[in-house]
């Protein structure tokens, strides 16, 4: 049996955590003894409890300082790896990658690259700091056995910089809401065409511009639901009109997707958005900025139309196009389950793990 440990900053229910959880839930337990190592505080206690009840060993390092970890003070993590005697370490994120690259271990070291660091780090940290973080991260990645990008579009960037890189697209389980929301509860008419955005309200997500353009181009029967919080929340509220519902952070976004028609994102950079996959799983059309990862998922819908792309110059015309698409919710759901499922993602990762095991 292969002993595998997934390593992440902390485990929650969204973002890179959802990729880790989907892998854990879909690997063959007769072949893998699975552990999870979390580095910092911030774990969702419900998720940790469910994992342990499902036979996963969870190590919570609860280290306090991310910067100290990057500077080499990571003894708790090193001790866990030494005692665990793992065959495979699979890290997620810059700090886990850096720590893994410094280990003296016989374990084969995987990582999943969840973003385009050249865009994401620049937007998050500014030019000077982003150069430092990119150099640090690349140096770590080159020491690992395999770097798996979360999309082909991220792979197209990283293949220029890494010799040990491949890609496996993110996939998700079929999503289910934990509650029922009605359109009346959010003051939306039953016959309205409902657009929805779910995510952080920050500059990288370009949400202020999106609201401005929606206000400019929406028709009388169209509404936009905005789920999320963040640094741009006050500015978003100032730009909204009476067709925009600012609903704040919601723990059950799928319930709101179930009363929507179109998922919209004007993000400037994405790895392979889990929210987009969740929207497809709910049968929503996609109305997305024309960044590479968005182009990738829309272009996959060769036999059925799954959405429309826009840029800052043509969004008015793109609104006309999305209105004209004759979509079929059931076919969109089927498209997601056939092409972007957690089961398919896990099968592909299993193949990569097995290759490494055969080499040993």
Which residues does each PLM region occupy?
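Short hydrophobic beta-strand element within catalytic cores of glycosyltransferases
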Residues: 285-288
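Aromatic "clamp/platform" in nucleotide-sugar-dependent glycosyltransferases that forms part
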Residues: 249, 268
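Short His-centered aromatic/hydrophobic patch
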Residues: 91-97, 113
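Membrane-proximal helix-turn-helix segments that form the acceptor-binding/catalytic region
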Residues: 75-78, 129-147
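A charged, aromatic-enriched C-terminal amphipathic alpha-helix characteristic of glycosyltransferases
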Residues: 15, 327-358
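A conserved mid-protein helix/loop that constitutes part of the nucleotide-sugar donor-binding site
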Residues: 14-22, 193, 197-216, 231-234
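N-terminal strand-loop element at the rim of the active site
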Residues: 6-69, 154-157, 230
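Donor nucleotide-sugar binding/catalytic pocket of nucleotide-sugar-dependent glycosyltransferases
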Residues: 142-179
